């Protein structure tokens, strides 16, 4: 008889994968609602497109591999992949982008490795990075939050822009991106990085409409707080563990605080890092992916801290305003090494 050797813990929660995935999907509702409120109906359209694309792509591969389609689709992992990608891209990005990114995520980043449980990288973030590198202009074309927008697209407008690039009134994406100051708007992180490189002072930057006296940007801080609320609910439901989110956020806050204290005129304050971009989405919904994260408690703390450090480094010194996706994938690479050195020692065995 052959016994499989595994590191502790040896007892596991018996809740099915589909139930865990469903809890994560439900926890995403506050974040989705906040994005709909501040950025319009495009987010919902992207979610629908990504969900359908993810299910069809997964079904196709399962059929080709002669595996059970119905049983696998019921685990809800494909839906979660599509959802995470859809909420990460601009709400009015062309329809083919979210389809392409989702199909790539499901087929190449997940099924090519053998399906759920075998993929070393987070599929949604692989799809996001592929789109960001291939189509940087479209992937950074975020709408201004409703409070500072000149043109607020309705549901029909959102569908028209996503599928044709224009709306009935004759406007296009460039028109919809105009803020109250008549300038095309960007995210708070993008605005900060671009303005610092242009020689503007932090005091000037914080007067821009995208900040308008808010801690971390109009709309964006509420979106992050909504994702935080969903994440806290996941912790309460014991669907995720606290180690990764806590170490990630503490490390990011610590690095941002130290950087800001040493260079307040070129580096963003900690509240901007914590409440802008995909910080809370990454902390609770992406980094906590049980397949691609570390499996030991010490390893989870190291994994989260590494991701937090990478996010700060990329945002502060890299070429991209929000480094969550890249940080997640780089941290994924280190998981086997982290797990190797943080495995619990077998009782009775000496170290060395």
Swiss-Prot record:
Keyword Transmembrane helix: yes
GO cellular component, one term: plasma membrane
Modified residues (FMN phosphoryl threonine): 187
GO biological process, one term: electron transport chain
Main localization, broad class: membrane
UniProt topology in membrane: Multi-pass membrane protein
Enzyme class: translocase
Subunit comment: The complex is composed of six subunits: RsxA, RsxB, RsxC, RsxD, RsxE and RsxG.
The name this protein goes by in its record: Ion-translocating oxidoreductase complex subunit D
Organism field: Escherichia coli (strain SMS-3-5 / SECEC)
């Amino acid at each position: 008889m052959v016994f499989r050797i595994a590191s502790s813990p040896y007892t596991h929660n018996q809740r099915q994968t589909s139930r865990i995935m469903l809890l994560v999907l439900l926890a995403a509702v506050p974040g989705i609602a906040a994005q709909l409120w501040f950025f319009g109906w495009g987010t919902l359209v992207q979610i629908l497109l990504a969900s359908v694309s993810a299910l069809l792509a997964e079904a196709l591969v399962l059929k080709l591999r002669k595996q059970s389609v119905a049983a696998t689709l019921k685990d809800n992992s494909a839906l979660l992949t599509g959802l995470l990608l859809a909420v990460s891209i601009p709400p009015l990005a062309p329809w083919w982008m979210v389809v392409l990114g989702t199909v790539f995520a499901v087929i190449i980043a997940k099924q090519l490795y053998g399906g759920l449980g075998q993929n070393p990288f987070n599929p949604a973030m692989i799809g996001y990075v592929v789109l960001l590198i291939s189509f940087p202009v479209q992937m950074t074309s975020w709408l201004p939050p409703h409070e500072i927008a000149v043109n607020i697209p309705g549901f029909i407008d959102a569908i028209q822009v996503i599928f044709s690039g224009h709306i009935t009134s004759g406007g296009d994406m460039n028109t919809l991106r105009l803020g109250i100051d008549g300038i095309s708007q960007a995210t708070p992180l993008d605005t900060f990085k671009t303005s610092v490189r242009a020689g503007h002072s932090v005091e000037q930057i914080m007067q821009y409409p995208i900040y308008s006296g808010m801690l971390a940007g109009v709309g964006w801080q509420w979106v992050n707080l909504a994702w935080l609320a969903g994440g806290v609910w996941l912790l309460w439901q014991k669907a995720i563990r606290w180690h990764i989110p806590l170490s990630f956020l503490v490390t990011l806050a610590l690095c941002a605080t130290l950087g800001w204290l040493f260079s307040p005129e070129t580096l963003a304050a900690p509240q901007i890092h914590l409440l802008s971009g995909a910080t809370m989405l990454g902390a609770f919904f992406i980094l906590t992916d049980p397949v691609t994260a570390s499996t030991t408690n010490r390893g989870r703390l190291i994994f989260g801290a590494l991701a937090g450090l990478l996010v700060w480094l990329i945002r502060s010194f890299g070429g991209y305003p929000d480094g969550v996706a890249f940080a997640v994938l780089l941290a994924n690479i280190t998981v086997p090494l982290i797990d190797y050195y943080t495995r619990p020692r077998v009782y009775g065995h000496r170290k060395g």
